[in-house]
Design a protein with these regions (language model features):
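Preference for long, amphipathic alpha-helical scaffolds in soluble/luminal domains
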Residues: 1-273
């Protein structure tokens, strides 16, 4: 999370600012620690109740760092994404993970977030091609159409699979049984909602406004009188929970940096990041 914070701060600091060098060095240090601590399966650690969320935050932190201009090991990023995306079953439309504590929401949000940038990149490429007359106005996102635009076949397959996954997951956003998570709200639920918010901004389309309204209504009902939110299981810290809720409700304010993540997936192969 520190890496994500610093990645947001660095682009806003002019190089003449006294803090720029300190933030830049701290970001480099965090990025090195994160990349060096990844396990071979693409996850991080296992020292938490729902490790799938821990690994999801690690995966998205790599994306934030790349968007901030840092050189990210493409193998590490691809491994992190694949680990999370593998928790979604395309045949059943369900999500599960050994380290999700048996809660589908956590695996769902992590897999959705891991695929979101590639899904958004696929959408971006197809929409721009239609606007420029390269593809017909009714063209859909397919491997063949992506290859027509110059994307090599392996990358076209990756982008399309992520796009198809995210489109399938959109159908689950009204599933209250899924969204209820553990059954009452802990920091894990708020973090999952935040991951979905980022996913919807990344992948583009019309789903974000509807989701934002749903979350505004949901969070207003459980906000404490002092303006904070607190968890009722596991992660109970009002500081953590309130921060996650605020980011859940304001993900679109990070749209410029999130779009930078899209642009990288739309223009280069992961190993060249």
């Amino acid at each position: 999370m520190t890496l994500q914070f610093l990645s947001r701060v660095l682009p806003k600091l002019p190089k003449s600012d006294p803090l720029h060098q300190q933030v830049n060095q701290a970001l480099d240090k965090c990025l090195a620690k994160l990349q060096n601590s990844q396990q071979q399966d693409g996850s991080w650690g296992g020292g938490s109740w729902a490790g799938v969320l821990q690994s999801s935050v690690g995966c998205s932190a790599l994306e934030w760092a790349a968007a901030a201009g840092k050189t990210v090991d493409g193998t590490v990023l691809a491994r992190a994404r694949d680990h999370q995306k593998g928790n979604f079953n395309a045949e059943t439309g369900r999500s599960s993970a050994p380290d999700s504590a048996g809660i589908e929401l956590y695996a769902f949000a992590g897999s959705q977030r891991a695929a979101a940038s590639e899904a958004g990149a696929a959408r971006q490429l197809i929409e721009e091609a239609k606007e420029n007359g390269i593809l017909p106005a009714d063209a859909s996102c397919t491997v063949e159409n992506l290859m027509t635009l110059g994307v090599d076949k392996p990358q076209a397959n990756t982008l399309y699979k992520s796009y198809a996954q995210n489109m399938a997951q959109l159908e689950q956003l009204d599933n209250e049984q899924l969204l209820s998570g553990f059954g009452n709200n802990g920091g894990e639920e708020f973090l999952s909602y935040m991951l979905t918010s980022e996913s919807l901004v990344l992948q583009g389309g019309n789903a974000w406004p509807k989701w934002k309204q749903k979350m505004n209504t949901r969070m207003a009902k459980i906000q404490i009188a002092n303006g904070s939110w607190t968890g009722h299981h596991c992660i109970t810290s009002p500081v953590f929970c309130t921060a996650a809720v605020i980011q859940c409700l304001t993900a679109d304010r990070d749209e410029v940096l999130l779009r930078a993540i899209n642009n990288q997936d739309a223009s280069v192969k992961p190993e060249r990041l």
